[in-house]
Amino acid sequence: MQTRCLPDRHDAGATVRRVRAIHAPVTGAVLAGLVAALALIAPPCASAGSAIGAPASLAIPAENWEVRTRLSDVIFATSREVAAQKPRVLTQETGAARVRFQVQQQDGAVYLVFSNPRGAGYPLDSAGTFIIKRSLADGSFVQVKVFVQDDPGTYLRIFPDGDRTVMDAWLFGEPFQSRVALPVAFDRVLTAPLSSIVEWSAAAVDWSLLLKPSPAPEDRRLQEIAGTLQARLRTLRDMDDGAMDGSGRMVYIATGAPAARGGFNCSGFAKWVVDGLYAPLAGHPMEIGPLKSRNAGRDNPWSTRFEEEMDPWFGLDWTRGLARTLAQEQAGTVPADARVDVRDADHLAYIRDVGYPVQSLQGLLYFLARRDPGKIYLGSVNAPSSAVSEGTPTLRQHHHVIVLLPYFDSDGAFQVVVMERNLRTSIPSLVRRYGSEYVHLVRIDPRGEFDPPPVPGAR
């Protein structure tokens, strides 16, 4: 039996320190399903006067309506006069203290950009930035684009539609809510506070999801765990089929034989992370034997004879075993697979024992972190293997295990820490390597002490 870690596909060069926003593509169908699933447990958005709909209850980005109002003569000037405007930074008393105004021309349109500061600059996609688009040909207003998070794919598009004003909302580059009617003339939007737009649409738009959240204590807990792991990564050794057994020795997973200096493969590394929660409770790391146990109830009859030869379900059984073993130590009972798996099969495109497209992983983690903050996820990456022999159906091979820590930082920005085989990588790195594959997720409850066991021979 061989563990399926595929180290030759591991993108060590993709190591990153921080993932600020979601850039992995999320299909519209999957995103719609995620929204529907989350709506079952999140309160629906209410009217403008309710606790949810009121601007005071939401993390609305810094406002720049004061500067837009001050420059209303420019906004409504002729397109030729607008194009002649020079860039400048203006101060205001409310919202963003400083706002950069500039004009850009492209493809027959002129853009009036009111950028809020972020870091040392004024990026176009900073939260709260308004971009007004006008036609150069006739000066007509085409649309207003408003970024509502520090992410290029999370914004509002507001446009005139006859005598109506209509708004589309986008989240991570995919449609979130479309053709929301606003009860005001389009001209009023041009100088209106974002908080007013939120109020006007509170009954139709789930702003609690579209705007960034306030971090919860569970988010800070995950950030601390990620920091602990990051500090230890450089001391770990890499070794095919390597893991730590129940007595703290470095061994080969397949045989249990001692492994000299030893090291971790992807499966062994994930075990070591979960042992950081298990060992303080049990007094020792997990035993390897039970984690390798195959799920007889999951096997397909035609594939049983290939289990010993190819062990196609290893990553799935291993990650479920880690989740079950920890949960049993925490609660005293062994949970069923359905309790540790991330399924939501009634609303999401979950495939049994396969999971979700890797392409959709970061969007899925965003909603999981909003719905159930503070959880760690183990992923088993899988894809169809080559046919065992002519005329034999292709098997599904679970070949790689990853550790995922999704949380919202102190600024409310979404972060996903990805760790795999002793390295920190990223969601974009996973998508580059496994973009056409699937990942099955199990959840880990990180309550209690976190102290990964010492590794013999660590550097």
Model-derived regions: residue spans:
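Bacterial N-terminal signal peptides
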Residues: 28-42
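Bacterial N-terminal signal peptides that target proteins for export
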Residues: 11, 16-32
